[in-house]
């Protein structure tokens, strides 16, 4: 059984699910139809149908996948709304995950399909909310090996006209999440991601503005198995030890703006955040969120005066 001798370097290089890609082309047709001819007795105000087809390739026009997507949504007269989306993506290849490896130029991906449901509550000045649920394999935009489930909720609370609080939480997990390690070495994990976004906005007349926002991400990858990609795009199990890991990400900012003169503004900004990766199995949400707060990569206080000519 082999073990990586440079585990920390390997885990710095992997994409953790956030990969910038080049060598990519996309073509598609996006079509929509809106219907508003509902009589007075109907609770519906308007509905909309969207039907999309697309093909994704690399720069050599080798097909990565073809997809179709169908969505149906509507708005009610009480300002509530809903949207249901379904997609199907053909089996194809991922040309980007192996970073131009000569040993494995691409990895084969299976048929993908799934459903998304979005619900929006009635809109009012005091309280607003929305719910979402996703279940499927991949999406119309990318391919995956295993099924994923994501659910989330967002609520906005305005106790006064000049004060607003917003809270969003999203929880997702995925079977057989494929992650690049090095060259043609890849790992398959059980992935879980939890995201919380909290914000507050306050306005004091025309001169004062205070904004506070925090975004926290806890990303965990467990039960790793190592695989080698080959020239045909197949994945073969290999006896290499991979460690589970936990990623914590924080972006926190407090920003105060004061209008000194017309077109002249004073900004006072405090920012803190960063990303920490540990090769462990910590799963407590509070502990994962706290890591970049205790050991931030950025911690700054800025005062700036801006004048617009």
How does the language model describe each region?
Residues 8-9, 33-37, 51-59, 86-92, ...:
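Transmembrane beta-strands of outer-membrane beta-barrel pores
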Residues 25-31, 66-70, 113-117, 129, ...:
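Hydrophobic, lipid-facing positions within transmembrane beta-strands of outer-membrane proteins
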Residues 252-270, 291-309:
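Outer-membrane beta-barrel "beta-signal"
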Residues 5, 31, 47-51, 82-86, ...:
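Membrane-embedded beta-strand positions of outer-membrane beta-barrel proteins
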Residues 1-11:
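Single conserved hydrophobic/aromatic residue that forms the stacking wall/gate
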Residues 33-35, 55, 72-78, 120-121, ...:
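Residue-level signature of outer-membrane beta-barrel architecture
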Residues 36-48, 75-84, 124-128, 162:
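Short loop/turn motifs that connect adjacent beta-strands in outer-membrane beta-barrel proteins
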Residues 15-19, 56-57, 100-105, 136-142, ...:
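Extracellular loop and loop/strand-boundary signature of outer-membrane beta-barrel proteins
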């Amino acid at each position: 059984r082999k073990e990586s001798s440079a585990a920390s370097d390997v885990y710095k290089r992997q994409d953790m699910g956030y990969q910038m890609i080049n060598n990519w082309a996309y073509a598609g047709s996006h079509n929509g139809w809106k219907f508003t001819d509902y009589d007075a007795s109907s609770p519906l105000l308007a509905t909309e149908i969207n039907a999309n087809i697309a093909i994704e390739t690399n720069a050599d026009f080798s097909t990565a996948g073809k997809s179709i997507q169908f969505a149906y949504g509507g708005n009610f007269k009480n300002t509530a709304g809903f949207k249901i989306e379904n997609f199907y993506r053909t089996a194809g290849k991922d040309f980007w995950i192996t970073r131009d490896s000569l040993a494995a130029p691409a990895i084969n991906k299976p048929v993908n399909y799934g459903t998304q449901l979005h619900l929006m509550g009635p809109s009012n000045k005091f309280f607003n909310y929305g719910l979402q649920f996703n279940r499927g394999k991949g999406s119309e935009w990318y391919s995956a090996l295993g099924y994923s489930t994501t659910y989330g909720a967002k609520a906005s609370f305005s106790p006064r006209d000049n004060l607003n609080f917003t809270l969003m939480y999203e929880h997702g997990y995925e079977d057989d999440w494929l992650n690049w390690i090095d060259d043609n070495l890849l790992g398959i994990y059980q992935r879980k991601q939890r995201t919380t976004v909290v914000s507050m906005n306050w306005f004091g007349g025309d001169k004062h503005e205070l904004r506070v926002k925090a975004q926290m991400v806890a990303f965990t990858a467990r039960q790793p198995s190592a695989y080698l990609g080959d020239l045909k795009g197949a994945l073969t199990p290999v006896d290499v030890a991979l460690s589970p890991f936990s990623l914590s990400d924080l972006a926190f900012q407090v920003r105060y703006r004061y209008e000194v003169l017309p077109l002249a503004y004073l900004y006072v900004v405090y920012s803190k955040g960063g990303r920490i990766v540990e090769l462990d199995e910590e799963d407590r949400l509070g502990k994962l969120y706290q890591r970049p707060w205790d050991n931030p990569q950025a911690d700054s206080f800025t005062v700036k005066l801006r004048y617009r000519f």
